[in-house]
């Protein structure tokens, strides 16, 4: 009878905390949005499921061996940990606080101690360490995106590169906004955290994950969820801004058909882009290097098998583990913070400012050019590929049934991918030194 009662007391249900319950509901909401509403299902399904797994009571799937040991709080383990950390207190809360300032040697010793007491790293923690903490996951995704990208529309109309650059204004505006909130005492964001939040404005999930994992890993869950949620909401967020900033006549502008781009141009462009960026901004080289490599495999025509693997099987496999890894950061004690609200608000501001900046840049360019651009393609400067370009095309068709802007909008859309990677390099360079 005692054994049965002990087994019942060990049921996770009796150890469920209110925060974990809320985050399990958040995970279910993400799954609902992905499955029923089709909001970025490729990422939100694994993120939502990972969020549920990481909040299951007593499972410890998203915690390291050290964190699992502290959570269990066995007296003999806490005594050993406090000796390593040189603490007078054996309380788990004090030990947990001391871990944030522990030296690498102390962390290594604690990890070995935890393993000696039969504690191990959780499954999701291992996924995170391999896929995100190492930086490998987002970089492989970028290679796959490069293999799927056609630079033809950008090369056929190079001035659309300016639209992609203008849309990154949302990133830097949001960084300043986050710092302003901190200075006013509304929120408490460090410079590194502000930079990581700002990248949401690039509408590029892999870049947001890459930058936040380097600058503010504690905010990774909220930043990734915000980035992919707002990317899915591009068809709802952008059209009102586009219509507000353009006249009916501007939306009716029909653009000239793009010229045919020579294969040699497509092969040479990723090489030239990589060399140029590497010489000017080395910190952006990892992202753009993998992006350009993927694109070169696509365009060179001699490695079809590698190109096909990069843009299909490989990117799909990595997406699964990347999503689960992001889900591991949706633990209640890390996600249910006042900062999360600030991130969600700043993220939507970043999207809106980036969209508006692209449209306004197109209007400005029209003042100095005889060949008119339809300002609607400026909104595609955010790097939500190809959703933003499709939105530009849809709004254009509403104004003029003969106005097909999709291929024209792909130019600034692809430029936005380059722009967000460059912006990420700038953030990493000046925040990390």
Swiss-Prot record:
Q: Which InterPro entries match?
A: OadB_MmdB
Which chemical reaction does it catalyze? oxaloacetate + 2 Na(+)(in) + H(+) = pyruvate + 2 Na(+)(out) + CO2
Query: Where in or outside the cell is it found?
Result: Cell membrane
Q: What is its main location?
A: membrane
One Pfam family recorded for the sequence: OAD_beta
Extract one GO cellular component term from the record.
plasma membrane
Identify the cofactor(s): Na(+)
The molecular function terms in GO held by this entry are:
decarboxylation-driven active transmembrane transporter activity; lyase activity
Q: What class of enzyme is it?
A: translocase
Keyword terms: Cell membrane, Ion transport, Membrane, Sodium, Sodium transport, Translocase, Transmembrane, Transmembrane helix, Transport
The answer to whether UniProt assigns keyword Transport to this entry is yes
Its membrane topology is listed as: Multi-pass membrane protein
PANTHER family linked:
OXALOACETATE DECARBOXYLASE BETA CHAIN 2
Protein family membership: Belongs to the GcdB/MmdB/OadB family.
Assembly, in brief, is:
Heterotrimer of an alpha, a beta and a gamma subunit.
**What's the protein name?**
Probable oxaloacetate decarboxylase beta chain
Q: What species is given as this protein's source?
A: Vibrio cholerae serotype O1 (strain ATCC 39315 / El Tor Inaba N16961)
Q: Encoded by which gene?
A: oadB
